Design a protein with these regions (language model features):
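Alpha-helical transmembrane segments and their immediate juxtamembrane cytosolic regions
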Residues: 1-245
Length: 245
């Protein structure tokens, strides 16, 4: 089971990587009519994938499929599995020029670091502190015995996490991180197995138990995705064949 937990922990970086990449690539975008047309391709692909998914569900599961269900399934983002990401991305895309204005108006690196600390504290940090049960000694030896935890820091803004990842992506594009690649790789591997061991402990004696710490606003995916993004960014592609690029 431990290997499966390691894999589950590692794969939790999937969505955060896309959000980091969005901030990294779109940090210079400005408000204009041309900008808004940029989402057209994404929406077209989404509609096509929704159509394909609904046809499959109709054939394989007997789900209702007609013009009405297709329109409603597209508009409410239920026709295609994991459509929630497109729903989130539409909002992030619309906000991006304004987020860029806010980020760009900060005068120096220190102010931008304060911005990152603020959004990370509001969205990511709660998943580090609000996950323990201090009311039961038995819980510490058997964490699967109860799902009750004490809140230690505010968590209302956790749903704001896409914007936190976006700003981190903006910062990485502008400043990067001054750390040796080898050190970063060691830190990534160490963090992966540390978090996996923690997740194994939290699930010991039963099937895998998820929690805020491993959700996309959790501290585990945040640390792993930022380190992995920085490592991928340092891969030199100049001498790679075009097919590999």
């Amino acid at each position: 089971m431990y290997i499966a937990v390691v894999m589950r922990t590692l794969f939790s970086v999937c969505v955060p990587l896309f959000m980091l990449l969005t901030g990294y690539l779109m940090s210079k975008k400005e408000l204009s009519k041309k900008y808004y047309s940029g989402i057209t391709k994404t929406l077209v692909v989404f509609v096509i994938s929704t159509l394909a998914c609904m046809i499959y569900k109709n054939i394989a599961q007997g789900d209702v499929f007609d013009l009405k269900s297709f329109i409603l399934g597209t508009l409410d983002f239920t026709g295609s599995n994991y459509s929630w990401y497109i729903e989130m991305y539409i909002g992030l895309f619309l906000l991006a020029p304004f987020l860029n204005l806010a980020y760009g108006k900060l005068k120096n690196k220190k102010q931008k670091q304060v911005l990152l600390i603020t959004v990370v504290f509001l969205t990511i940090v709660p998943s580090l502190f609000n996950i323990f049960n201090f009311g039961s000694l038995d819980w510490w030896t058997n964490p699967t015995s109860s799902d009750e935890f004490q809140k230690l820091v505010p968590s209302w803004w956790q749903g704001f996490y896409p914007v936190a990842y976006y700003f981190v992506g903006c910062y990485i594009r502008e400043y990067g991180l001054k750390m040796k690649t080898r050190t970063m790789l060691i830190l990534f591997v160490f963090s992966l197995f540390l978090f996996s061991t923690f997740n194994f402990f939290r699930s010991y004696g039963t099937t895998f138990k998820s929690g805020t710490y491993i959700y996309w606003y959790g501290f585990e995916p945040f640390v792993l995705s930022v380190l992995l993004f920085l490592l991928i960014k340092r891969i030199k592609t100049e001498n790679m064949p075009k097919a590999a690029k």
